[in-house]
Amino acid sequence: SYSSKIKTLLHPEFLFPQSPSIQSEEELKQLQQQFYDSPNPMFESGISSAVLATQVMRNAFGIEPHAAFGYSMGEVSMLFSLGVWGSMDPMSEVLNASPLFHERIAGPMNSVREYWKLKDTDFQNESLWNWYTLRAEPELVAKALEKRERVYLVLINTPQEVVIAGEPSACKELIQELQCESHEIPVTDVVHCPPVQSEYEEIKKVHTNKVVDKPKVDFFSAADYTTTKLDSEILADNIARFYGRTVDFSKLVEEVYHSGARIFIDMGPRSSCARWISENLGDRTHLSLGICLLYTSDAADDRL
């Protein structure tokens, strides 16, 4: 069983607000921001939603995967969703007791403060860290970053789209230099960059789970961009390593495609990964589908 407290892990108070006090779009936005500012509930609900969606695909539609890979936290989701790891309850207990998302890579972001050698009085009244999606080629962004500090290339989505993160002013200066389309994204933790490397042991501890099954599925990891062994120590190390460096989703998609995959089903929110997969593969033979569209009722979705 995935969990004895699935309702708690889903955090329905954020995903499915039913309170009579939510009367306006503005109040809904405030609740959404509260969710963004709660990394542990976001982590747990994201994984739990993927687990449930995967069970529906397998049990209701009879769809079984030959390969699996994830985008950032999606690598954790795939291991629970396909039964490599068992119950999430022990991990939830470790996660919520850990300083990792409370103060190290979220909240006051002390790992960043230490890495940048900030004073206690620095960034008390302004944002320390922001994320931005850029419509720009990864190579151009990486080149521009060579002479900059406090801003990092954290994710490569496609050959034309990346994600940067860091001190807001440094990010905006980079965007101004590149003269590219950009969008701020509501992420409130620090991952996939050097300031996180000091947290390797704690990240590994949080993600150390007993392997309870080894399905006949090729599991790909962003740690080495190849298939991984289903070993508790190796899986935790994979995740702890890629938390501290850029994740190249484009490279991961290419590796999975070269392994023979042609049909891709995105189990995450907004079908973003489905879009990125298609952008990466272009005119090559493939089908990329997402199960979730923002603000679209599943019952009313005419694709089902």
PLM feature spans:
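Acyltransferase
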Residues: E25-M267, S272-C273
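Active-site machinery of serine-nucleophile hydrolases
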Residues: S1-Q30
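Structural alpha-beta junctions
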Residues: S3, C180-E181, D283-S288
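Short acidic, glycine/proline-enriched helix-loop-strand junctions
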Residues: A274-I291
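Conserved small/polar residues in nucleotide/adenosyl-binding loops
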Residues: Y295-D302
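Short, acidic/turn-prone active-site loops that include or flank metal/cofactor-
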Residues: V187-T188, I291-L294
